[in-house]
Amino acid sequence: MSLSKIIPSNKKEEQKSINAIFNSIDKSEGIIFNSGAGAGKTYALIESLKYIIRNYEKSLKQHNQQIICITYTNVATKEVKERLGNTDLVLVSTIHERMWGLIKDYQKELVEIHKEKLEDEISSLKQKLEKGQGYEKFQELEEDLKGNFKKIMIENRELFFQNYSAKAAEVKKSFKILLNDYPNMLKNVGNFKRIVNAIYKLDQYSKCYENISLNKQGYKSVEYNSIYNNDQLYKMRISHDTLLDYGLKIIKKYDLLKQIIIDKYPFIFIDEYQDTDEKVILIMSYLEQYAKKIDHKIFIGYFGDTAQNIYDDGVGSEITKIHSGLKQIDKVFNRRSTKEVIEVINKIRNDSIEQISIYDDCEGGSVKFYKGTSGNVKDLIERYIYEWKITTENQLHCLVLTNKIVAEYSGFKNIYEAFKETDKYKGSNYNQLNTELLSNDLSKLGEIPKLLFNIVRLQNNLVDKTTSVIDITPKESLFDEMSIEGLRNLIKLLKQYQGKTLGEYIESISTVYSQVNDENYKKIIDWTFGFENITFELFKNHLIEKLFNNILDDDVDRATATIQKILEVDIVEYGLWYKFIMDKQEEKVIYHTYHGTKGREFDNVIIIMENAFGRNHNYFNFFFENFLHPDVLEGEKKLNFEKIKNLLYVSCSRAIKNLRVLYIDDVTDFESEIKEMFGEVYPF
């Protein structure tokens, strides 16, 4: 088995689906290209791009036109660029980078949309202050007292944030004299903070709105930067989700912009369409509709697979409801896995796409399903480390259901445990932790995880001798007018940071920041942190504000203690977390969440499975119990079944050669269904 000898008749048959894409390209006919896991979707995408270059290069260059290819991740962007080769005709990027490229030059229109966003936010904040729960003490005040209270708090913003993480008694003491006329306001410090935070936001947004209206310098353009995963609307800065909102609004509203995009980019490809935000699909639909209206040509091609839709924010099978009239082209050949793996994933998928290997030498893989207990996990892994001759060059990839296990086995258990205790990620928000702390897609990291990632990346880049100076910050203009000596001094300043823990490292940054007067140095630090005038206390309070929003008096000590845990984690552990996010782990056994393997492929895969997943205690058992008769399911149960099926399909289809599954709960009630899928169930 080497998966190298392509059967000529299969190659010829596969080419028919590729030719169908070419035919639609020539006719400017929108398509959905569905291909199962390992089918060579990227190959088909590359071939389509090459076809356009071969046949339309002269015309594209004459009309100053280009091809857009939107990928789901930066890793995919890199892969497409490498496989496509050097060309200026194709713009390959993630959706956020491309969306910004399409709209960033229309600042007048963007500022108007930003102004509308501010209006909505201002209205929402006023509503909270006037009628919201938790704001009652402010609502009880007379209008003149409300105005005076706002004035006092705005003038004492620094004092407020200095005491943000302090105990209730200390907060009351700090504001006792200032708020002498407001005896009821400090009775509940949690509500006091909630009210004041709303006042500060309202003040910032109102000033920004006014400055836009007055056409003041600094308020004439909107900025998007991929490093931040949070909006700072009052600074005219937007993040990922808001960028897509603005993109949809501006393209929907302005026909001239639609025509400019259509005429400049007559070919648009979207990779992994099933995981793409609905707003992007809407934009594409508007473009195609308008192209038909003005009788201009545009080709829009969606490449992906609805059976691999595993993210809640992806459009999935709803795509045809949003963008109608698309031609469907399916591909059934598998270019990744052995015959043994393909047979299993076909049974899991169980739809119109039944894959066969494109290769003649596709036999020789192995699939086994074990039943056991959690106590068997370590022994199973050890067995296959020996049997499969696992090394750092021939790694074993183990998929586990819980973030806790991934974090523990990957070396950053303390980071995970600390974040799990925050209000942001506990209770009903627990499932967010999977994506916002462990995602390899940086745009999906939570606001605070992304902030810590930026800091650890800076630390990593400073100690890594292979990192270029430019990689320390994307703001290349910082270095334009700097001498070599100035550059050396800047790097020397940055390398002064010391500290065994994250907290000590941040304190070190804060100390240097307060002592030096180097404008470029401060720009790099401000850019890394996302805010200015860095102090250790400000940083701690920022973490509390974001991870324990509107905490009550009784919770201040708990919040402070949890933030302290985050700060006391060894910087080396943060380095291991950084490697996990960047997919640069070097161990023999690599641990993943099920979701974290999307788009990947591995020779050797072990999947640990149980009934429960997250807060759902009847997850995979529900799927297996209904596997033979899914048609009887309706509504939420049907949607849940499809979601679980997709996740299992994605997970099992990562395997190239060897696949093992260990189910660590009792399978008696659905063992026959497992046998239908995997052939046999072996006791471990």
UniProtKB/Swiss-Prot annotation:
Keyword Transferase: no
Domain UvrD-like helicase ATP-binding intervals: 14-351
Alphabetical GO biological process terms: defense response to virus; recombinational repair
Molecular function as annotated in GO: 3'-5' DNA helicase activity; ATP binding; DNA binding; hydrolase activity
Annotated binding of ATP, by residue: S35, G36, A37, G38, A39, G40, K41, T42
GO cellular component, one term: cytosol
Leader peptide range in chain numbering: none
Domain of life: Bacteria
Keywords carried by this UniProt record: Antiviral defense, ATP-binding, Helicase, Host-virus interaction, Hydrolase, Nucleotide-binding
InterPro entries noted in UniProt: DExx_box_DNA_helicase_dom_sf (IPR013986), DNA_helicase_UvrD/REP (IPR000212), P-loop_NTPase (IPR027417), UvrD-like_ATP-bd (IPR014016)
Marked site positions, Interaction with GajA: L256, Q259
PANTHER family named among the record's database cross-references: DNA 3'-5' HELICASE, UVRD / RECB / PCRA DNA HELICASE FAMILY MEMBER
Similarity comment: Belongs to the helicase family.
Quaternary structure note: Homodimer. Interacts with GajA; 2 GajB dimers dock at opposite sides of the GajA complex to form a 4:4 GajA-GajB assembly (GajAB). GajAB interacts with Bacillus phage Phi3T Gad1 protein; this interaction forms a 4:4:8 GajAB-Gad1 complex and leads to GajAB inhibition.
Protein name as annotated: Gabija protein GajB
Gene assigned in the entry: gajB
